[in-house]
């Protein structure tokens, strides 16, 4: 029997789940738009969908913030209907061999900083900055970075007085241990500086391929958190950022100079990375590492199919949109190929070369989110394999165990 959510969304297949509940594809019965539906039992011990829906309403209209289509109670469950988005940066990181080029990291960093700044401008902290919570868009918004999962978000300004929340200590760790700030590990109340420090760890994770505190053995979660804390605090910034541009060390040093209630200079941090981008001669052409890999695979697959009829490429990108299309028949493969051809004018088998001709002006003086006003193309996510979630995943601070975002079907195991 078909299940209709909110009177107009026909529930489809399950694409993910976690301690909060489950995530499904759904189709609008009239427009056939494909959306994502997050469902939780209304009697759950720690319901979060109502709070999350409230946050999305507050952030509504911001670039890179998913739109809420509907929220309400459906029988015995709470349901949140949202824009369907593409793969997470964690998915794409794995797809690209667990390392991103500096060019890709810098293009992502600019948008990620803008997302965090926007959330802060609305008076909230995210408190769970990690690769799994940044998703790429689909179709014409495939180059736009989205920030999701506000289940752990918290106001840092009093709604009535607009005063900053008071400094506190002895707080439980809230967020994901791998990317948590040093102060968060030490039990200090989080503020804007902590979201930014977490972003720094995400960027280094992308550049390095891993962080020094991954893979630590422990008998339980507390011991693991303690070991991560000890390793993180004892690792000098210069060691963490060794063999990478000095701007990344400067980023961390700046974060560590911020006082508890100080407003970060987001523009300074973006200029730091934009100047590096310009100095390296990169062009802001939205050709990410995965764009090139997808293009190369498309070319290889095309050549193989010409040589052997019926052959196919066994390695699927997490943004494959061959199934469950809800809008125009737009192939991500063709889209990626076109971007590579038109932007770089490169040959049929491009290599990942992130340099442009000397003196070329990068595209930072143009809006980063140049596609934000274009119509969205509703496409389905690809890989929906469930993976185990390890002890470094999000912790809400009240001991409820692991908690994942609404795209948990894309989650990779913590190491």
Curated annotation (Swiss-Prot):
Effect of inactivating the gene: Hypersensitivity to blue light (BL) leading to shortened hypocotyls in BL.
Composition skew (Polar residues), residue ranges: 303-314, 373-415
Reaction catalysed by this enzyme: L-seryl-[protein] + ATP = O-phospho-L-seryl-[protein] + ADP + H(+); L-threonyl-[protein] + ATP = O-phospho-L-threonyl-[protein] + ADP + H(+)
Gene Ontology MF terms in the entry? ATP binding; protein serine kinase activity; protein serine/threonine kinase activity
Instruction: Report the top EC class in one word.
Output: transferase
Q: What induces it?
A: Induced by blue light.
**Domain Protein kinase, residue spans:** 9-277
Q: Which PANTHER family match?
A: CASEIN KINASE-RELATED
- Identify this protein by name: Casein kinase 1-like protein 3
């Amino acid at each position: 029997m078909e299940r209709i959510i909110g009177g107009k969304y026909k529930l489809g297949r399950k694409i993910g789940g976690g301690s909060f509940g489950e995530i499904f594809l759904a189709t609008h019965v009239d427009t056939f738009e494909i959306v994502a539906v997050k469902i939780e039992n209304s009697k759950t011990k720690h319901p979060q969908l109502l709070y999350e829906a409230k946050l999305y309403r507050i952030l509504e209209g911001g670039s890179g913030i998913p739109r809420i289509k509907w929220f309400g109670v459906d029988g015995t469950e709470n349901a949140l209907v949202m824009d369907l988005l593409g793969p997470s940066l964690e998915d794409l990181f794995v797809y690209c061999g667990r390392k991103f080029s500096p060019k890709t990291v810098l293009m992502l960093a600019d948008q990620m900083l803008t997302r965090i700044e926007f959330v802060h401008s609305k008076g909230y902290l995210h408190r769970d900055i990690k690769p799994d919570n940044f998703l790429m868009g689909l179709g014409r918004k495939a180059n736009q970075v989205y920030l999701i999962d506000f289940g752990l978000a918290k106001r840092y300004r009093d709604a009535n007085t607009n005063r900053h929340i008071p400094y506190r200590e002895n707080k439980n760790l809230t967020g994901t241990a791998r990317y948590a700030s040093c102060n968060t590990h030490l039990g200090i109340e989080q503020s804007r500086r902590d979201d930014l420090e977490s972003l720094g760890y995400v960027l280094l994770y992308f550049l390095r391929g891993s962080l020094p505190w991954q893979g630590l053995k422990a008998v339980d979660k507390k011991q693991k958190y303690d070991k991560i804390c000890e390793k993180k605090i004892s690792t000098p910034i210069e060691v963490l950022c060794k063999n990478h541009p000095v701007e990344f060390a400067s980023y961390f040093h700046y974060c560590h100079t911020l006082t508890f209630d100080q407003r970060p200079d987001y523009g300074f941090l973006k200029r730091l990375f934009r100047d590096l981008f310009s100095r390296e001669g990169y062009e802001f052409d939205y050709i990410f590492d995965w764009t090139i890999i997808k293009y190369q695979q498309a070319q290889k697959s095309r050549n193989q199919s010409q040589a052997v009829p019926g052959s196919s490429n066994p390695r699927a990108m997490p943004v494959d949109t061959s199934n469950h299309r809800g809008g125009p028949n737009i192939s991500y493969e063709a889209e990626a190929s076109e971007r590579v051809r038109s932007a770089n004018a490169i040959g049929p088998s491009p290599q990942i070369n992130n340099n442009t001709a000397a003196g070329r002006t990068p595209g930072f003086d143009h809006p980063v989110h140049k596609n934000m006003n274009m119509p969205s193309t509703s496409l389905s996510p690809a890989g929906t394999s469930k993976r185990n979630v390890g002890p470094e995943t999000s912790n809400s601070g009240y001991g409820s165990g692991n908690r994942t975002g609404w795209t948990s079907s894309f989650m990779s195991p913590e190491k």
